Amino acid sequence: MHEQLNSRVETCYLQAETFFKRTFKRPVVSFQLRGQKAGVAHLHENLLRFNPQLYQENAEDFLRQTVPHEVAHLVAHQLFGGGIQPHGEEWQLIMRGVYELPPNRCHTYAVQRRSVIRYIYRCPCPDSDFPFTSQRHSMVRKGRRYLCRRCREPLMFSGETRTE
């Protein structure tokens, strides 16, 4: 799976070197990215991070658009220095001129949100469900108390959880 992406990174660098008639230092490529971002270019570390889940689910477009997008950031940084805008003229020049791609800033991949467990707390008031995050539930277990704003009684864990 990663070989294709690494190969595409190399191809993008070869295209940039042919276009600009100079060499570029190759980055470290990592697949340690989660969440909504498809890729991130760390300019000062010369590092590219890619989201393996989004790559797996959108491989064709990822290789065609996302990889050149991130490589263009590193190439722009090596050519023009740190004083440029992330998606500014220099980056757009590379996207259009070198890779012949539209300089799109964001991907349109469907991103699955992770499910979240809520811990249900209650007070004596009718219809008083208070869904707590795991972090807040942990604070209660360590001794923190939360009060109902209406009756001023402490909220008590009901033993119920809900997945959202």
UniProtKB/Swiss-Prot annotation:
It comes from Pseudomonas syringae pv. tomato (strain ATCC BAA-871 / DC3000). The gene is sprT. Its main location: cytoplasm. One of its GO terms (molecular function) is zinc ion binding. It is found in: Cytoplasm. GO terms for biological process: response to stress. The keyword Metal-binding applies. Residues 17-155 form the SprT-like domain. InterPro entries: SprT-like_domain (IPR006640), Uncharacterised_SprT (IPR023483). Zn(2+) binds at residues 69, 73. Belongs to the SprT family. Binds 1 zinc ion. The active site is at residue 70. SMART domains: SprT. This is Protein SprT. It holds the Pfam family SprT-like. Keywords: Cytoplasm, Metal-binding, Zinc. HAMAP family: SprT. Its cofactor is Zn(2+). GO terms for cellular component: cytoplasm.
